[in-house]
């Protein structure tokens, strides 16, 4: 990963991004003594999600099915699936549900969680993935933990990872993830 770190300027409250001509002001949140992140929340932003889905769908033509994790990836994967005319997409849940039959489980520790979480898919979804080209979709990739867990689920279900896409990469660039923009991490000079 190639890191993208900007110096934090005392008193700075926002970071502005522009993706596909749409500008958004993101609040800077302190996450440690010397580190701030620009908080990105796309839930409810139909205009932004629709525009990003248009661009990301171009990268996923040729996939048979898409997978994401709950919950912020759901509106994005829904829009992309609509554009690609996919009849179904898979959502990995963040905990086992009583209705799941023979669930597949992969553990990860996203940057927004204090403890490891389990990403799970119902075993009844395996036929939708097995022997298929699967596009992995996320709104933002920070530590790559969630994306890696989704990859594991695809492989466990017998699918092939087609491509991995995200609206934003945070703090660095991963060569195997296609994206629309980068969010830097902000560090205070010591």
Task: Please give the residue ranges for each predicted region.
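Active-site-facing substrate-recognition patch
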Residues: 1-62
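PRPP-dependent phosphoribosyltransferase catalytic core
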Residues: 2-10, 148-190
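Short glycine-rich phosphate-binding loop at a beta-alpha junction
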Residues: 63-70
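Conserved acidic residues
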Residues: 64, 132, 162
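Gly/Ser/Thr-rich loops at beta-strand to alpha-helix junctions
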Residues: 70-76, 142-143
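Short Gly/Thr/Asp-enriched flexible loops that form oxyanion-binding sites at enzyme active sites
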Residues: 75-84, 151
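A short helix->loop->beta-strand "cap" motif at the edges of active sites that frequently abuts
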Residues: 85-87, 159
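Short, glycine/charge-rich flexible loops or terminal/linker lids adjacent to PRPP-binding catalytic cores
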Residues: 87-134
